[in-house]
Curated annotation (Swiss-Prot):
Classification via Gene3D superfamilies: Phosphatidic acid phosphatase type 2/haloperoxidase
Protein name: Phospholipid phosphatase-related protein type 1
Stretches that traverse the bilayer: 13-33, 67-87, 127-147, 201-218, 230-247, 257-277
GN (gene name): Plppr1
Localization per Swiss-Prot or TrEMBL: Cell membrane; Cell projection, Neuron projection
């Protein structure tokens, strides 16, 4: 029910946000927590070939010793798109040239008789909320893939230290079905079984692509043609280098990084195009044109074609009038 031209009354937006959106978000965060911080989901024990050179790379150390540690990665992934969206929305709202189009796309929502939700607040919550949901969803997909496949890292045999004396491992092509012959540190071995897909690659490309889609869809720069491309390509390049770092440190295979890039790209494209609709506002339904009165419009109209008989008759009539005069 419309109250004014730019105000719309809604009694369902707040209950839907509390009892649907927040519940789904809480369930997603909880599932990501169980994957990340508990042993609820056991990793598949995968076998390996004896003396496999692809699994005997040097141990690069713990994840905290990596050039891009998990703490730094998660902070940058969460903060960068959030800051871009927050600054971008506030800037567009207070700039006169973009504020008019923003207000035209988003209506002021009146909930009940007292509470107003401005277009600025709705857009910030929508875009950042969808980004956070996608970030946790990508983490769930990655952990599920690692648990199901149990793909071994390039340094697996280095930390596994398998007991070959208890197996028939005379040939290099001998496959060991029993993956429980490792004698190394169990915690390190557990992490060495979680290689596919690469979590760093999936999360970094998701965050970078989501931010890039927001920049290209909402931010308008008439004075500079290269500002947006440089910012977007720089963001995507950072994600690409993050994946390459995983390969250079022997923490993931090339196939793991590629799969992570594909996964993160798919999630970002789906949310950006199908959920937030390329970061466009929810425009009101355009007013339908008033239908014409059917009584004043003919059912079918044809172009008038002059008959040859009428032409000949007119000529004869003209000739007869000439003779009379």
């Amino acid at each position: 029910m419309a109250v004014e031209n730019n105000t719309q009354r809604s009694y369902s937006i707040i209950p839907c946000f509390i009892f649907v959106e927040l519940v789904i978000m809480a369930g997603t965060v909880l599932l990501a927590y169980y994957f990340e911080c508990t042993d609820t989901f056991q990793v598949h024990i995968q076998g390996f070939f004896c003396q496999d050179g692809d699994l005997m790379k040097p141990y690069p150390g713990t994840e905290e010793e990596s050039f891009i540690s998990p703490l730094v990665l998660y902070c940058v992934l969460a903060a960068t798109p959030t800051a871009i969206i927050f600054i971008g929305e506030i800037s567009m709202y207070f700039i006169k040239s973009t504020r008019e189009s923003l207000i035209a796309e988003e209506k002021m929502i009146l909930t009940g008789d007292c509470c107003y939700l401005s277009p600025l607040l709705r857009r910030i919550i929508r875009f950042i909320g969808v980004f956070a949901f996608g970030l946790f969803a990508t983490d769930i997909f990655v952990n599920a893939g690692q648990v199901v496949t149990g793909h071994l890292t390039p340094y697996f045999l280095t930390v596994c230290q398998p007991n070959y004396t208890s197996t028939d491992c005379r040939a290099h092509q001998q496959f060991i079905n029993n993956g429980n012959i490792c004698t190394g540190d169990l915690e390190v071995i557990e992490k060495a079984r979680r290689s596919f897909p690469s979590k760093h690659a999936a999360l970094s490309i998701y965050s970078a692509l989501y931010a890039t889609m927001y920049i290209t869809s909402t931010i308008k720069t008439k004075s500079s043609r290269l500002a947006k491309p440089v910012l977007c390509l720089g963001t995507l390049c950072t994600a690409f280098l993050t994946g390459l770092n995983r390969v250079s440190e022997y923490r993931n295979h090339c196939s793991d990084v590629i799969a992570g890039f594909i996964l993160g790209t798919a999630v970002a494209l789906f949310l950006g195009m199908c959920v937030v609709h390329n970061f466009r506002g929810t425009q009101g339904s355009p007013s339908k044109p008033k239908p014409e009165d059917p009584r004043g419009v003919p059912l079918m109209a044809f172009p008038r074609i002059e008959s040859p008989l009428e032409t000949l008759s007119a000529q004869n009539h003209s000739a007869s009038m000439t003779e009379v005069t």
